[in-house]
């Protein structure tokens, strides 16, 4: 059964992971099935992310990010016990969720969690951690049509993330 589920998982490409002015949702063959362009996004490279921001983000979202292989076993167990309705996903799983799956609660199933798990392993195998984290911070939505950490910093604080003081990132 697991192989059948994995076989139905979408193929993740670098194009899907890279942030663009448009957010797209893709089918398993890599075809765009949904697109949204009325968003704000200002891309920031990994080497421009303040160290404090990275530490705070990982402490909050995935404290084993640089040690794990793309998945959180604890998070997966948590999701299975809650029938796929609870979080605990790794950074890789969250990134996969943002680029490949619907955010609709009714779509959160054990099958989808298995696909996320598999795709997160593939992500971790095919790309390095810094690249994955760069894509992640540029894909996340923080409200008000703002996508990515840099856009959030500009929207809420009036300055880009790499120009913020060390006191400010903890408020993001």
Model-derived segments and their meaning:
Residues 1-172:
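Juxtamembrane regions of bacterial inner-membrane/periplasmic proteins
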């Amino acid at each position: 059964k697991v192989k059948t589920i994995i076989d139905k998982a979408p193929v993740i490409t670098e194009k899907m992971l890279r942030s663009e002015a448009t957010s797209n949702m893709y089918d398993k063959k890599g075809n765009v099935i949904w697109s949204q362009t009325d968003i704000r996004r200002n891309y920031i490279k990994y080497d421009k992310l303040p160290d404090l921001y990275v530490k705070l983000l990982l402490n909050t979202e995935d404290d084993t990010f640089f040690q794990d292989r793309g998945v959180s076993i604890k998070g997966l167990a948590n999701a299975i016990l809650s029938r796929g309705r609870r979080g605990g996903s790794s950074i890789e799983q969250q990134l996969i969720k943002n680029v490949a799956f619907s955010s609709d609660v009714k779509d959160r199933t054990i099958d989808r969690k298995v696909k996320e798990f598999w795709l997160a392993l593939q992500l971790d195998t095919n790309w390095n951690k810094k690249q994955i984290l760069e894509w992640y911070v540029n894909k996340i939505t923080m409200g008000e049509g703002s996508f990515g950490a840099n856009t959030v910093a500009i929207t809420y604080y009036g300055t880009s993330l790499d120009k913020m003081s060390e006191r400010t990132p903890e408020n993001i």
